[in-house]
């Protein structure tokens, strides 16, 4: 059998009239749809069975031939072929138009393709097509210009002047068709190329545009006259169905109405032509036909849209494709699936990390086919029908079978919005009572789920391959690290943190202090019987824990610890050191010696000499998990996480921490602090009234005063807090709340934002314990409302940003092992002024070196070229005092349509080298988009006079960077490398002038008077350096410097925004996105190549075009790099399917059709649209057609890491 989906590429072209006829199964001549009495399709109508096929399987219209045995026979009575009814989704008809009609996409689009081909303005075209003017087609011997327009009156005058038949002029689409037929593509192209050599300015731009379109026609084999239709295809009837509603009425697709209008007008025109009606009547009918076809193809593109009942515009063919509800985004990129369900989620604290609880009723419905198969196999029922009845009856025996069926059959759980790949994970189902899905508490963070009524969807993978993938690649227990930064995403939260915090507290003088136990069991027994407290410091024999990595001098001794810490260390992986202190030294280097008793030493003496340790907080638990993962990988880590969870829940229950109003302390000197602030504000206002400061200065001073007062209260609160206060414990452990919540409960609420976003000068002096006055309450509602609306707007903005990012990078896949490039990226720590945004150590981890790294003092080679830098290696490099390293980077990768493994480095989600087939583009887009909601919306005011411009931050700044827009608050940059020799202020024009002396000459830059300078006289500056504060315009930087410096700048800018909000994102994700913005070049001079000047093309295509020319000794083309925003880059992608499904569908398809574009289906989106397996992961060609070997040929090696993909592919075969 031929697999219809195994094709290499897909092409779109203009349809020639002969092509349309070859598709068609007959002409639709009548506007009728179905007979309202018999409900059968009318002959020669829009639903005719003769043309489109039978409405019932294997049955002709009159009923003479029924059953499959007559397959392929055409009925002699009704003329209907006996076949499947499904052909009504495939067979097309056609309408023979009695007058040519222009296709609105090619005449109306921007730029008008018809206009460019004919070198006529769109307005002139419109006048001709809609019968407002004549156009001269052939002037013969008259002095008329070809393509010139004549009004009705001028036409008559010219006819009288030159005589009938002395020239040819027509109106309507036929005139345009005649002109298009006369276009000599080769001659026009040669002429334009000649003109381009001398032209400049507007004239050149126009010539380049025309050349582009004419060249497209020339190369694609499309004929320009096909932009005018003589024959109209009719799409299959099942794609524009009529459905009977209850009540006898019909709901029909709008397309039927639009087709009916076309047929009616076409038939009327045919009759008028037969009757030889007067020209003006025929003309009017032709114009109406043109409008009817326009409405069918794209209703509302020209003039008022045609409306149906209730003045609703009808949905035309174009609208069927466009937008979120269009064919692309609604049905092709995402479909509804069966074997799925959704329900509210509840917590499942007893589940293992790879399990989820599925309600019985839900499971029986989801796994019905599997259960039925088993029933038949066990011979409880004779056939599938009986088995189905058994399941529906709820027979007792089905539950045991269900248990068997779901064993080892993973299911997928998804929570909307799915912001990153951790939004869908696989679990093994466990049957439970009730109606809610049970979710493991640790995976909540990845899903961003909580149990206040969230719902989740469940899906069943059906095929063996799908099950294998779910189990090997998507199991929740495997997803411990977050792909965006490589940090653990499954850290314990809330109660689990609190329990472990309480467990690891230490306290002096509690019962049992100084007791010595032989092992853990004895200590636990003492604690259970009330002889020792959880927090008491006691001794334990080191030898009772022989597997721990003790130092030699620590063995056979007694160690001081607490009962709680004995329990805490009991759940740790054996090879981790015994944890006494919540710091990295203890975790990586081992337990400090001070906790061990020397022989004969008194334990109480040692205890008294030790400081009381702080307990383990959320951050410390995160570090322990990361270390565990680094050493033992997933299996051990997920088991450890489950133990940590159980211990945390158990002890937070025992601790029984609660919050009462008495737990909120009263600050003793609150009144003094507030009085002092009032006094200071009064002084400021007095100074303002005397005219000693401006209103802006006064506002800043007042708000600063209140802010300082609030901070003073906060400081006092921290100084006086009791570490055993439950609120303090919750806050300190990181379980819930932070110091700002605490200070609003106990200190003062402070300054509030007014509805316009400006901070009000009147602070709220009360705190929640004292209670707010009515006025204070009213003030605080402004901020609360603003917070809610901001969040709602931000979510939509952030979602749209993610969609654009995914679209631009979806075809970036790891394609090969090593691209062999000789370029690299020199990196150092990213700084913002004096602050370090991202350290060199962070940037080095998990990357490959480009050159070897040497110790700056000793010259010893720390690491060779093209080696992977591990976490420890990165620390070693930084400790040696190295400040910059050249690494392999996505920016400089030479792989086409993707990235190679060495330029990418490790996969942050697994901590191992990335595998070929990983869809790194999508992961990068999700990693940047997912934290988008955490970024702020507002544009900050830097306060008062000092600000020259508002610096954009947060989400708007990220959008500004990725869309390559000109930034707000733009910095002035220098184009000269040299020294700043002078900065002169010109008071009359309120500007400053900066002079930079370079080798090639002096650069003079005018800077606004208020701008804050970044340079001083005598400073050395590089090309592209900013002279003033603010953001550099990247397009400008690209003109002054090279591509790499723009990429480096954009990377640093994105990181600044995210890091300032406390969000960490791996550099490589930003690199992938930024690289996609710089994939194109614009051809400046084509040299000896056949490229067109001004064309935008992919860097790799441009290099290819030049390669052949250089080899044959010709002059290569020159080009200039182009920086594109992500939206523009998505639309300029080589795949027209991907671009059309993103935005501006009609424009993309119009352009692709004229060029006869081929889509080679390299990206993920294109393959999803046509229903092929995506070319990433196990779907890559190299993993698919694998020949299985016999088992005895394969060498079996113990303890080898096998990639999940390899395992799966072998199973799939």
From Swiss-Prot:
Binds 1 Mg(2+) ion per subunit. Binds 2 Zn(2+) ions per subunit. Keywords: DNA-directed RNA polymerase, Magnesium, Metal-binding, Nucleotidyltransferase, Transcription, Transferase, Zinc. GO terms for cellular component: DNA-directed RNA polymerase complex. The keyword Magnesium applies. Mg(2+) binds at residues 450, 452, 454. GO terms for biological process: DNA-templated transcription. Pfam families: RNA_pol_Rpb1_1, RNA_pol_Rpb1_2, RNA_pol_Rpb1_3, RNA_pol_Rpb1_4, RNA_pol_Rpb1_5. GO terms for molecular function: DNA binding; DNA-directed RNA polymerase activity; magnesium ion binding; zinc ion binding. Its cofactor is Mg(2+); Zn(2+). It catalyses: RNA(n) + a ribonucleoside 5'-triphosphate = RNA(n+1) + diphosphate. Its EC number is 2.7.7.6. It is an enzyme of class 2 (transferase). Zn(2+) 1 binds at residues 60, 62, 75, 78. Zn(2+) 2 binds at residues 819, 893, 900, 903. The RNAP catalytic core consists of 2 alpha, 1 beta, 1 beta' and 1 omega subunit. When a sigma factor is associated with the core the holoenzyme is formed, which can initiate transcription. Belongs to the RNA polymerase beta' chain family. DNA-dependent RNA polymerase catalyzes the transcription of DNA into RNA using the four ribonucleoside triphosphates as substrates. This is DNA-directed RNA polymerase subunit beta'.
């Amino acid at each position: 059998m031929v697999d219809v989906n195994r094709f290499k590429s897909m092409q779109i072209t203009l349809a020639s009239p002969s092509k349309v006829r070859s598709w068609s199964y007959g002409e639709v001549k009548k506007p009728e749809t179905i007979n309202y009495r018999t409900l059968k399709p009318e002959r020669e109508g829009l639903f005719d069975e003769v043309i489109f096929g039978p409405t019932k399987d294997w049955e002709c219209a009159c009923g003479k031939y029924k059953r499959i045995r007559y397959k392929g026979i055409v009925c002699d009575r009704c003329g209907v072929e006996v076949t499947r009814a499904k052909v009504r989704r495939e067979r097309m008809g056609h309408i023979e138009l009695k007058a040519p009609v222009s296709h609105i996409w090619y005449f109306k689009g921007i730029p008008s393709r018809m206009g460019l081909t004919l070198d006529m303005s769109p307005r002139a075209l419109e006048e001709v097509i809609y019968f407002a003017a004549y156009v001269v087609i052939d002037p013969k011997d008259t002095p008329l210009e070809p393509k010139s327009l004549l009004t009705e009156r001028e036409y008559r005058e010219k006819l009288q002047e030159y005589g009938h038949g002395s020239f040819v002029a027509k109106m309507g689409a036929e005139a345009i068709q005649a002109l298009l037929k006369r276009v000599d593509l080769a001659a026009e192209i040669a002429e334009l190329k000649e003109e381009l050599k001398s032209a400049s300015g507007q004239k050149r731009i126009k010539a380049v545009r025309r050349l582009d379109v004419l060249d497209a026609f020339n190369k694609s084999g499309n004929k320009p006259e096909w932009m005018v239709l003589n024959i109209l295809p009719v799409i299959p009837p099942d794609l524009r169905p009529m459905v009977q509603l209850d009540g006898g009425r019909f709901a029909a697709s709008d397309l039927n109405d639009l087709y009916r209008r076309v047929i009616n007008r076409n038939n009327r025109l045919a009759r008028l032509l037969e009757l030889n009606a007067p020209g003006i009547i025929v003309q009017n009918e032709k114009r109406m036909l043109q409008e009817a076809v326009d409405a069918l193809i794209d209703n509302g593109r020209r003039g008022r849209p045609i409306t149906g009942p209730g003045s609703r515009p009808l949905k035309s063919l174009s609208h069927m494709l466009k937008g979120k509800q269009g064919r692309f985004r609604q049905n092709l990129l995402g479909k509804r699936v069966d074997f799925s369900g959704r329900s509210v989620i509840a917590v499942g604290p007893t589940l293992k990390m790879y399990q989820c609880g599925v309600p019985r009723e839900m499971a029986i419905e989801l796994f019905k086919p599997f259960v039925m198969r088993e029933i038949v196999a066990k011979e409880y029922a004779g056939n599938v029908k009986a088995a189905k009845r058994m399941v529906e009856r709820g027979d007792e025996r089905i539950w045991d079978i269900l248990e068997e069926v779901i064993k080892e059959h993973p299911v997928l759980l998804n929570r909307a919005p799915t912001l990153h790949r951790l939004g869908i994970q696989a679990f093994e189902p466990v049957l439970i009572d009730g109606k809610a899905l049970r979710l493991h508490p640790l995976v909540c963070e990845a899903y961003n789920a909580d149990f206040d009524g969230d719902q989740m969807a469940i899906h069943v993978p059906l095929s063996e391959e799908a099950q294998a993938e779910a189990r090997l690649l998507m199991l929740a227990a495997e997803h411990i690290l977050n792909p965006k930064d490589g940090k653990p995403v499954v850290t314990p939260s809330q109660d689990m943190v609190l329990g472990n915090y309480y467990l690891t507290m230490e306290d002096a003088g509690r019962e049992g202090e100084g007791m010595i136990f032989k092992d853990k069991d004895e200590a636990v027994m003492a604690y259970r019987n009330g002889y020792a407290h959880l927090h008491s410091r006691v001794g334990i024999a080191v030898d009772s824990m022989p597997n721990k990595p003790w130092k030699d001098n620590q063995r056979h001794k007694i160690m001081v610890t607490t009962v709680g810490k004995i329990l805490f260390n009991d759940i740790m992986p054996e090879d981790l050191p015994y944890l006494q202190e919540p710091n990295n030294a203890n975790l990586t280097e081992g337990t400090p010696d001070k906790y061990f008793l020397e022989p004969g030493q008194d334990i109480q003496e040692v205890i008294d000499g030790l400081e009381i340790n702080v307990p383990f907080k959320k951050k410390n638990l995160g570090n322990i998990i990361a270390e565990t993962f680094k050493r033992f990988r997933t299996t051990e880590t997920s088991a450890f996480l489950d133990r940590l969870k159980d211990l945390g829940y158990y002890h937070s229950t025992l601790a029984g921490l609660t919050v009462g109003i008495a737990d909120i302390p009263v600050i003793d000197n609150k009144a003094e602090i507030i009085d002092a602030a009032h006094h200071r504000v009064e002084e400021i206002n007095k100074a303002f009234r005397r005219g000693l400061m401006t209103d802006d200065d006064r506002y800043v001073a007042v708000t600063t005063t209140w802010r300082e007062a609030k901070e003073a209260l906060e400081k006092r609160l921290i100084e006086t807090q009791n570490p055993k206060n439950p609120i303090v414990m919750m806050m300190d452990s990181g379980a819930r709340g932070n110091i700002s919540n605490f200070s609003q409960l106990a200190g003062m609420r402070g300054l509030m934002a007014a509805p316009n976003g400006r901070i009000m000068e009147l602070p709220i002096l009360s705190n929640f314990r004292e209670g707010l006055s009515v006025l204070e309450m009213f003030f605080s509602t402004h901020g609360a409302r603003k917070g809610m609306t901001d969040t709602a707007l931000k979510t939509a903005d952030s979602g749209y940003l993610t969609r654009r990012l995914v679209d631009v990078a979806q075809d970036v896949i790891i394609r090969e092992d090593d691209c062999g490039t000789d370029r690299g990226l020199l990196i150092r720590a990213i700084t913002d002024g004096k602050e370090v945004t991202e350290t060199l150590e962070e940037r080095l981890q998990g990357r490959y070196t480009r050159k070897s790294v040497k110790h700056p003092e000793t010259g010893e080679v720390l690491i060779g070229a093209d080696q992977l830098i591990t976490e420890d290696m990165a620390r070693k490099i930084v400790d040696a005092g190295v400040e910059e390293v050249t690494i392999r980077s996505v920016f400089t990768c030479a792989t086409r349509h993707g990235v190679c493994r060495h330029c990418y480095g490790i996969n942050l989600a697994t901590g191992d080298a990335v595998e070929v087939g990983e869809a790194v583009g999508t992961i990068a887009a999700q990693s940047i988009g997912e934290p988008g909601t955490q970024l702020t919306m507002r544009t900050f005011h830097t306060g008062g006079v000092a600000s020259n411009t508002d610096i954009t931050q947060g989400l708007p700044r990220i959008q500004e960077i990725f869309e390559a827009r000109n930034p707000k608050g733009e910095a002035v940059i220098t184009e000269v490398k040299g020294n700043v020799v002078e900065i002169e202020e010109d008071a009359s024009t309120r500007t400053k002038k900066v002079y930079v002396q370079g080798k090639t000459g002096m650069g003079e830059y005018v800077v606004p008077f208020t701008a804050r300078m970044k340079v001083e006289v005598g400073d050395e500056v590089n090309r592209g350096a900013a002279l003033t504060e603010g953001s550099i315009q990247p397009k400008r930087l690209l003109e002054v410097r090279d591509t790499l410096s723009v990429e480096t700048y954009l990377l640093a800018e994105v990181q600044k925004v995210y890091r300032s909000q406390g969000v960490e994102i791996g550099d490589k994700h930003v690199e992938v996105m930024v690289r996609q913005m710089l994939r194109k070049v614009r051809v400046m001079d084509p040299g000896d190549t056949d490229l067109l000047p001004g064309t935008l093309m992919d860097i790799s295509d441009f290099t290819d075009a030049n390669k052949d020319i250089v080899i044959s000794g010709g002059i290569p083309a020159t080009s200039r790099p182009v920086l594109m925003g992500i939206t523009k880059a998505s639309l300029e992608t080589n795949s027209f399917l991907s671009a059309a499904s993103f935005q501006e569908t009609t424009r993309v398809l119009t352009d692709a059709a004229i060029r006869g574009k081929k889509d080679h289906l390299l990206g993920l989106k294109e393959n999803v649209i046509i229903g092929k397996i995506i070319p990433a992961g196990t779907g890559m060609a190299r993993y698919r057609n694998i020949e299985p070997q016999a088992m005895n040929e394969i060498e079996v090696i113990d303890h080898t890491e096998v990639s999940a993909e390899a395992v799966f592919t072998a199973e799939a075969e």
